[in-house]
Structures are given as structure tokens and as C-alpha cells.
């Protein structure tokens, strides 16, 4: 990812909690709007944009993760690969972080394994290595 490690969890490159909360509220509206319009790919792009990786506030990360994980869980199995194919490397890394977070919940595991398979297929093992070695969490 194109973030500087010195800024990890320090808030230096991040926003205030109030700004993150406003962004998350807007993200939720945009994701819902895209889904209601039958545009799950647009919803995915919005959901993966600007994750709150620089905040130490777990509630903010949880709130954003809920939006992303609910979206990922709503995809039909057959649409996952098509959606992953349109993502760039940074989006793949962010998506893989959410996939691991989703798998950790133990809910909807089959769909998260499908996402994992497709991200790995497109991004290669480097995606996994970057995600597990990176300090910034979602």
C-alpha cells in the first residue's frame, strides 16, 4: 500500500475521529445507494475507499468494517470474481484485510473464502504477505 509506515496508528496522516465518523456515515449512504441502484461494484469501490487505518479508535474501525463485511456478505458467489477483477492492487490489499476480518467472525465463512480465493488468484501471494505483515489494520 502507498501509506508511510511512520504514520501508522499515529494519526499524523489520518483524520480526527469526528471526520472518520462523518466519512463512515457518508460511505454507508453511498454503499446503500449503489446497492439499491443495482450497482454492487460501485458499492464495493466506495466501501474500500479511504479505510480508517490511522485511527486507534476500535469503534470507528468496527463501524466501517460492519459496512464492508455486510456488503461482501451480500454478493452472490458468481459475482465475486468479476468484482475482484476490476480492483487495483491497493484495493485488493484493503479487501483482503476485510476478508480476514470477516473470516475471524466465523459468520458467512463460505462467501469470505470465495473472496479470499478470488483476491489471491488476482493479487497473488504478495497480497497475503502484505496484509499479514502490515501494521495498519481495518
UniProtKB/Swiss-Prot annotation:
Keywords: Actin-binding, Cell projection, Cytoplasm, Cytoskeleton. GO terms for cellular component: Arp2/3 protein complex; cell cortex; cytoplasm; cytosol; pseudopodium. It is found in: Cytoplasm, Cytoskeleton; Cytoplasm, Cytosol; Cytoplasm, Cell cortex; Cell projection, Pseudopodium. GO terms for biological process: actin filament polymerization; actin nucleation; Arp2/3 complex-mediated actin nucleation; exocytosis; phagocytosis; regulation of actin filament polymerization. GO terms for molecular function: actin filament binding. It comes from the Eukaryota. Residues 1-21 are annotated as: Disordered. Its main location: cytoplasm. Component of the Arp2/3 complex composed of arpB/Arp2, arpC/Arp3, arcA/p41-arc, arcB/p34-arc, arcC/p21-arc, arcD/p20-arc and arcE/p16-arc. Interacts with carmil (via the region between the LRR domain and COOH-terminal proline-rich domain); carmil is required for Arp2/3-dependent actin nucleation. Arp2/3 complex, MyoB, MyoC, and the alpha and beta subunits of capping protein all form a larger complex with carmil. Belongs to the ARPC5 family. Functions as a component of the Arp2/3 complex which is involved in regulation of actin polymerization and together with an activating nucleation-promoting factor (NPF) mediates the formation of branched actin networks. Seems to contact the pointed end of the daughter actin filament. The Arp2/3 complex is involved in organizing the actin system in cell motility and chemotaxis, in phagocytosis and macropinocytosis, at late steps of endosome processing, and in mitosis. This is Actin-related protein 2/3 complex subunit 5. It comes from Dictyostelium discoideum (Social amoeba). The lineage of its organism: Eukaryota, Amoebozoa, Evosea, Eumycetozoa, Dictyostelia. The gene is arcE.
Amino acid at each position: 500500500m502507498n501509506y508511510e509506515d511512520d504514520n501508522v496508528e499515529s494519526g499524523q496522516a489520518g483524520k480526527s475521529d469526528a471526520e472518520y465518523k462523518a466519512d463512515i456515515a457518508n460511505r454507508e449512504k453511498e454503499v446503500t445507494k449503489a446497492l439499491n441502484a443495482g450497482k454492487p461494484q460501485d458499492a464495493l469501490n466506495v466501501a474500500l475507499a479511504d479505510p480508517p487505518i490511522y485511527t486507534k479508535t476500535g469503534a470507528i474501525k468496527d463501524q466501517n468494517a460492519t459496512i464492508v463485511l455486510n456488503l461482501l456478505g451480500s454478493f452472490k458467489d458468481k459475482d465475486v470474481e468479476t468484482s475482484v477483477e476490476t480492483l487495483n492492487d491497493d484495493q485488493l490489499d484493503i479487501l483482503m484485510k476485510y476478508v480476514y476480518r470477516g473470516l475471524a467472525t466465523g459468520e458467512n465463512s463460505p462467501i469470505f473464502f470465495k473472496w479470499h480465493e478470488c483476491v489471491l488468484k488476482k493479487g497473488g501471494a504478495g497480497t497475503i504477505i502484505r496484509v499479514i505483515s502490515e501494521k495498519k489494520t481495518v
